[in-house]
Structures are given as structure tokens and as C-alpha cells.
């Protein structure tokens, strides 16, 4: 109908001797040029903000560039040196442990929180809005509050534990290497939990109630309904949420840098923090860029696996 209207307008203009040029008439009738006109600005913006920095990082990773020096081409020497570096191997291990632990906690706790929010009767909107607060507050600001709660000298957490007579000493949350990793995982989980909970809640709301009634009439209890109705229907949503969260968690910078700056003894360094310290603070731009590019194949593998899971879940449905 819209196409006929446009063609009619063009015919009227032609009858009055005011026919547009062939290029303009084609532009009005065909949808493809209009689509290109709309996506063009976004495409060039992404090209400038994403593609150009990526290509520049690729060049830096293949050079011995330092701060204030352009450097020269060294091939894969930066990557070879990193693979022989104990700090980088520790960073790789930290990133895997951090991402796996945080994703597991966010998935389990997010599902529990989504189920609780789904069953709310009173103050539903107020509580759901409050749950989003950790995700809304700027990361650096909220992490500073967490640092104040866990820092060794005036730790509110330690004061509370000692006041309740749970412990009688100050727990070194941030100076201890293993407790520091536990702390950054805890804060990252707190930060990302609302994203899981609200997204899974949207998936729960979309599940037809008739399926639960049918399962209940077949004798399925609450656990049976959860495993045989809720989980299968939430698999596509879970796969997408885990995919995005894996990308954000693996590339996390703010939480780790504000809390520990990668310490103590490099036990909480992730790719982003180690790349920042090596490339900007130490001035080794080439090696810092090489560290950041190690994220690319890992993220590519994560995306590939998760997309396969989404496709399988869609085929199952």
C-alpha cells in the first residue's frame, strides 16, 4: 500500500511536469537506500570507535612501542615474551578463576532472586526497582564503598564481625592474596546479580501458566516443575545472559583496580588491569596491547560456545 502511494505521488508530479529525477524516484520507491542511509552514521561511528582502536592495538602489539616512542616492528616477540612471563600466566589463571566463579555465583543466585521476585505479591514494583540499584550506581563509586568496608584499618565488616563475637581478630580481606580474590569475586557478583535476576524474571513472566498447571496435574512437585518446565524454557534466556556477563566479567577493570590494583603479589590481576599497568603505568605500550589482544581469542571462543548453546536451545524449543 505504501509503495503504491509513493508511485502515485511520483506519477502526479510527472503529470505536472515536476517529475523527480530517476535517482530520487528510485530512492523513494526502494527500501534498501533508505536502510543504508539510517545505518550509515552508526556504521561510521563504530568504525571510528571500535575498528580503528582495534587495528591500532594490533599494530602496537606487533611493535616495541613505548610511551613517547613510535617503536619498530618486532612481529610476535611481545606475545612470546608474555607466554614466558610468570605474571602473565598468573593473570591468565586469575582471569579464568575469577570469571568462572563469578558467573557460577551470578547464575545460581540470580535464578534464586528471580524466583523470589516472581512470587512477590506486595510492594512488587518497589522491590524490583531496588534490586536494580547495584547495577545503576557507577561502578567506581560503588566499588569505593566496598573498599572502605574491606580495607584493613577501618573495615566495617571486621568491626561488625568482632562486635557479634564471630571473630576476635581483623581479617585481612585485601592484603591476603586468596581473600583478595574472594573479595573481588564477591563485589563483581553483587554488581552483576541484578542483570541476571531481572532478565531471568522477564523470562519467567513469559512462561505460560498452563504448562505449570499441566505439570502439576501430572503429579510434578515444585522441584519437578522447576527442572522440567522452568529450566528448559529459560535456557535461551540463560545462554544470552551468561554470554553477555562472561564478556563483561572477563574484561572487568574498575572493580579489581579500585579494590586491589591487581595485588597483592599480582594475585588479582586480570587482563584489563595488567594491560593498563604494563602499557600505561610502565610505559610498555607494545606489551600492554599484546595483553589486551589475548582477550580476543578467549572472548571469541566464549561467544562461539554460547551461540551454539542458544541455537541448540532454540532447536529444542
Regions found by a protein language model. Name each.
Residues 34-317:
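A structural signal for multi-pass alpha-helical bundles of membrane permease subunits
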Residues 1-39, 122-124, 307-317:
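Transmembrane alpha-helical segments of polytopic membrane transport and secretion proteins
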Amino acid at each position: 500500500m505504501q509503495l503504491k502511494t509513493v508511485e502515485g505521488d511520483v506519477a502526479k508530479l510527472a503529470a505536472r511536469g515536476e517529475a523527480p529525477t530517476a535517482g530520487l524516484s528510485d530512492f523513494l520507491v526502494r527500501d534498501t537506500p533508505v536502510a543504508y542511509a539510517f545505518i550509515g552514521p552508526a556504521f561510521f561511528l563504530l568504525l571510528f570507535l571500535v575498528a580503528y582502536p582495534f587495528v591500532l592495538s594490533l599494530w602496537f602489539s606487533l611493535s616495541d612501542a613505548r610511551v613517547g616512542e613510535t617503536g619498530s616492528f618486532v612481529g610476535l616477540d611481545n606475545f612470546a615474551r608474555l607466554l614466558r612471563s610468570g605474571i602473565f600466566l598468573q593473570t591468565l589463571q586469575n582471569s579464568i578463576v575469577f570469571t568462572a566463579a563469578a558467573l557460577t555465583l551470578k547464575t545460581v543466585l540470580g535464578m534464586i532472586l528471580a524466583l523470589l521476585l516472581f512470587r512477590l505479591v506486595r510492594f512488587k514494583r518497589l522491590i524490583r526497582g531496588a534490586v536494580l540499584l547495584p547495577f545503576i550506581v557507577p561502578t567506581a563509586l560503588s566499588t569505593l564503598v566496598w573498599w572502605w568496608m574491606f580495607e584493613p584499618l577501618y573495615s566495617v565488616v571486621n568491626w561488625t564481625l568482632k562486635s557479634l563475637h564471630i571473630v576476635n581478630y581483623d581479617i585481612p580481606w585485601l592484603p591476603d592474596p586468596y581473600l583478595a580474590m574472594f573479595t573481588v569475586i564477591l563485589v563483581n557478583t553483587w554488581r552483576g546479580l541484578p542483570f541476571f535476576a531481572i532478565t531471568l524474571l522477564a523470562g519467567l513472566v513469559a512462561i505460560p501458566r498452563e504448562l505449570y498447571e499441566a505439570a502439576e496435574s501430572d503429579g510434578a512437585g515444585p522441584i519437578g516443575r522447576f527442572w522440567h518446565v522452568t529450566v528448559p524454557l529459560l535456557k535461551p534466556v540463560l545462554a544470552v545472559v551468561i554470554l553477555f556477563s562472561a564478556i563483561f566479567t572477563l574484561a572487568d577493570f574498575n572493580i579489581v583496580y579500585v579494590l586491589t590494583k591487581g595485588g597483592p603479589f599480582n594475585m588479582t590481576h586480570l587482563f584489563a588491569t595488567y594491560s593498563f599497568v604494563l602499557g600505561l603505568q610502565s610505559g610498555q605500550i607494545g606489551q600492554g596491547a599484546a595483553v589486551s589482544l589475548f582477550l580476543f581469542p578467549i572472548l571469541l571462543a566464549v561467544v562461539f560456545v554460547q551461540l551454539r548453546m542458544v541455537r541448540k536451545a532454540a532447536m529444542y524449543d
